[in-house]
Amino acid sequence: PPQYPEHVKPKEIDGIIITHAHLDHSGYVPSLFVSGHSRVYATPPTLELSRLLIEDMLKIEKNYHPFDIPEVYNMLRNSKEIGFREKVEKGNSSFELRSSGHVLGGGTVLVESGKKRLFYTGDINPKGSRMLPEADLDIGEIDLLITESTYSQTEQKPRKQSEEGLIDFANEVMDRKGILFVPAFSVERSQEIACVFRNAKFKHKIIMDGMALKVNEIMFQYPEYLRDPKIFADAINHSVAIRNDRDRKNALMEPCVVISPAGMLVGGNAVFYLQHLAFDSKNGIALVSYQGDGTPGKKLLETGKVSSRGHDMKVTAEVRQFEFSGHADRNDLFEMIKNVKGNPKVLTVHGDNESCIRFAEEIHERFGLEAYSPQVNETISV
């Protein structure tokens, strides 16, 4: 079940900035409108995608949530759309969002208060992707850097290597007259994978299904946030959208690639495709999303089994995993910190406790900056 930061009290908040739509950054915000009415600031696509993901979470997950649909709409009514590099004045401080390269509309946050300047990375991808431009890191001198640490202890494979590996795997599956199932996150990852296949001039049919189709529609509304809207449009227009069960069954009548949420195989149409494709050795399953502990995707990787009709069943389709992270890896993070101007204090967040602590130690060792991993509820002075 999700863990919510319920120690955060609505009446203590002057404003809320949503960096991007992923639920670990947006999913608690509606609860702040059960008894509060703060202003929410985010880019237009972030607000649209947040609504989509939060509503889907409430519909699918049966766990406890400290809010419901009325609070989601209350959040949206109290939201102000802002663009990148648009300065917002708030009391004696100001802030602006900068492109993060992580997900459509996703931003970093640059805050100025008096003579002090703070930069929060949120989730960041300095290199960008086929879909998104690289992060905007032209931020000037700063006094405090709050950086994600998700992959601070990991060096990722070059994206080109992952793309080529995926295409090679797909061709192998097509050669044996099978179907390749690519479970992918609905926001950005599904579209990125479609672009990878289109760029490779893949000859077989590409199927897209599930909430990724709604995300496609939102992305078409905001071409200015994409690296190249023509590349995105070309990839989506050359894919086949699944609209109902009949389409779904017909799609599996010939060799093809199926891109569909959920990325970790938790619910969504992934369950349908697993039941129909996982137990035939001609088929393939390409995992291109992070697989969290306790998820069916993680179970598949570790045991080679999935739950089917109440029983654990051995998967006979070929399973491979490919790295397509939207986060900065270890080298990206060190490069970003090396290029930061000023002599900032550094806080390492958004990683497991051990990674955050080790990353802070390494930052101090490499750059001589004061760095540490803060505790929940800790007050930081700059």
Placement of each model-derived feature along the sequence:
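Hard-cation-handling environments
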Residues: 167-289, 293, 350
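Conserved acidic residues
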Residues: 14, 143, 256, 283, ...
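Short, solvent-exposed amphipathic alpha-helical segments in soluble enzyme
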Residues: 34, 112-114, 135-138, 162, ...
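Redox- and metal-dependent alpha/beta enzyme cores, enriched for Fe-S-associated oxidoreductases
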Residues: 279-314
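His/Asp/Glu-rich metal-coordinating catalytic cores
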Residues: 1-17, 22-26, 31-206
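A general structural motif
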Residues: 157-162, 234-247, 264-266, 299-304, ...
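Glycine-rich phosphate-binding "P-loop"
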Residues: 147-164, 182, 229-232, 315-331
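A short, acidic, amphipathic alpha-helical segment used as a generic capping/interface helix at domain edges
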Residues: 268-274, 325-340
